[in-house]
Design a protein with these regions (language model features):
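Radical SAM enzyme [4Fe-4S]-AdoMet core and its adjacent flexible, acidic
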Residues: 48-175
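Canonical radical SAM enzyme core domain
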Residues: 1-31, 35-36, 40-46, 53-61, ...
Length: 175
């Protein structure tokens, strides 16, 4: 990162991570003001699909690494760390908001499972796992979630996203 310095231009670096290797690179990321987007789908029960390469669950390691970053670098954590969660059959919009807001005082980005490129023999499994963000938001509203303001704000973003994708052929979609 230090090699890319041009007078008059400020570079901002963004990194998406599952936080498994966070302790190894933590000081470097903080020193270089790298913005982090940490992938976590909620509580340990919600995070069931995020496993390490050998198939073991990763939640306890991820949670400990995030807490370590927050405890050791609170200002960096407040300004540079955000969360992305993927909605599926083991979580809900309300559960995700509740968990991340309670534990990290952050409002997460929430994405649906990507519908593109599903192998024909995996479609049934995908359909079982897929949960609509719009339906999950409605469920949170109907249940009187304590995070209605955040969820409603996110709902407006979802509506804008649908509009943009419907009316403009070339859109760039991220989290």
């Amino acid at each position: 990162l230090n090699a890319v310095k041009i007078k008059g231009i400020t570079f901002v670096y963004n990194l998406t991570t599952n936080a498994i290797l966070l302790p190894k690179y933590m000081n470097y990321l903080v020193e270089n003001d790298v913005h982090l987007l940490i992938s976590i789908d909620g509580s340990k029960q919600n995070n069931i699909y995020r496993v390490k390469k050998e198939g073991k669950e990763s939640f306890d390691i991820v949670f400990a690494n995030i807490k370590k970053l927050k405890d050791n670098h609170p200002n960096y954590f407040d300004s540079n760390v955000n969360f992305n969660s993927v909605l599926h059959d083991k979580n809900s919009v309300d559960q995700i908001y509740s968990y991340i807001k309670t534990n990290f005082d952050k409002t997460p980005y929430i994405s649906e499972l990507n519908r593109n490129g599903i192998a024909e023999d995996k479609k049934e499994e995908f359909n079982r796992m897929f949960h609509s963000k719009e339906d999950s938001i409605k469920q949170a509203v109907n249940c009187g979630s304590s995070y209605l303001k955040e969820i409603a704000d996110d709902s407006h973003i979802v509506q804008l996203d649908i509009f943009m994708q419907s009316y403009f052929g070339n859109t760039y979609k991220t989290i």
